[in-house]
Amino acid sequence: MIHKLDSHTHTLASGHAYNTIMEMAKAAVDQKLELLAVTDHAMAMPGTCHSFYFMNLRSLPRSMYGIEVLFGSEVNIMNYDGKLDMSQGLLEQMDVVVASMHTPCLKPGSIEEVTKGYLKAIENPFVNIIGHPDDARYPVDFELVVPAAKEHHVLLELNNSSLKPDSSRKEPLPNDIRMLELCKKYKAQIIVDSDAHNVWEVGG
């Protein structure tokens, strides 16, 4: 089934994004999306918000300008045992959790280490999406990760931001192709997200 949504976006709260929640919601409506998820960076990312921000997300309306809005976080995978930078208590409150590897939070490792880190994150019952697993700085064995994602009902992300010419991620296209081939082989589900950091990227 295909839904028109964007489940990985950032607001001013992330520290290096440029628009408010309401501005992002309005942009999603303009793009004729059915659903928007706001997933600001969790606490280990330099410059992002305090845990209190995520604790208070429950106070926000889940509909803006006629579009459904979910609130969650892009959490950081902090080590190759799958440790995340958000407590279980907070994870339980999130509508959606994207788990990703970022160089400010995790030094790139070997293919064995990275694969283990993703597998451990996939096993976390609060993780819904593995964010941009296409960065060659974090080499991954998709032959192991794709079946695991299917087994645990975790979505693998095709991240539009990775494919932009100015992306900081290394050699994403071959990894995306490999991931998609294996998702087709194993009938695993993917999700296409913008990773928007401003209104012009929403739904892209």
Where does each model-flagged region fall?
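Histidine/acidic-residue-rich catalytic or RNA/ligand-binding cores of hydrolases
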Residues: 15-19, 48-49, 139-147, 166-182, ...
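Extended substrate/RNA-proximal surfaces in nucleic-acid metabolism proteins
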Residues: 29, 42, 47-158
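Short acidic/histidine-rich active-site segments
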Residues: 41, 188-203
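His/Asp/Glu-enriched short active-site or ligand-binding loop at hydrolase and phosphoryl-transfer sites
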Residues: 155-168
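Histidine-centered catalytic micro-motifs
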Residues: 4-14, 38-41, 130-134, 194-196
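Metal-associated gating/positioning segment near the N- to mid-region
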Residues: 12-47
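Residue-level detector of anion-binding/catalytic polar loops
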Residues: 34-35, 155, 189
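Conserved short secondary-structure transition element at the edge of the structured enzyme core
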Residues: 176-194
